[in-house]
Amino acid sequence: MAITRIGPNQSINLASNITGTLPTGNGGTGATSFAPGKVLQVQHQEITTTVETSSSSFTDTGFSLAITPASTSSKILCVVNLQSLGKAASTTSALSVRIVRTSTDIGRTTNMMYTLAGSTYQTASIVKLDSPSTTSATTYKVTFKNRESNAVHFNAYTGDTSTFTLYEIGA
């Protein structure tokens, strides 16, 4: 590639003098088309209140998102971020969290948090790639339970924000 130097008061017509693909200064590739794997849509939900359960059965957290895939070959990337997972002081707790598509369990943790007596707070994430094989609206939910039958919660502190995000990935 030839290099052209211009002085401070000179100009060059970029439209007629430059050919090929110019690199971008913002981290882009300069590509004009992309291979499969592009994010087609995003659905997002936030919860800012404390959510608690004492149940030993999976209970709704309040996270529920619907997404309508553009193709049966699309994948759905599910990302859950729970802030300030905690429990009552002086109890033993083991928290389990799962992601459910309609009525199908697509991913779970067995012991996202396991603690003995004393207050403990953690931040945790679950990431799951799902293949719903449909173009119909599909609902994903996040549920949780305490395996020790004691109270557990997330968003323990004012200002905590837990999130649930779905990304449709094109095939």
Each model region followed by its residue ranges:
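Short, intrinsically disordered N-terminal pre-domain segments
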Residues: 1-13, 170
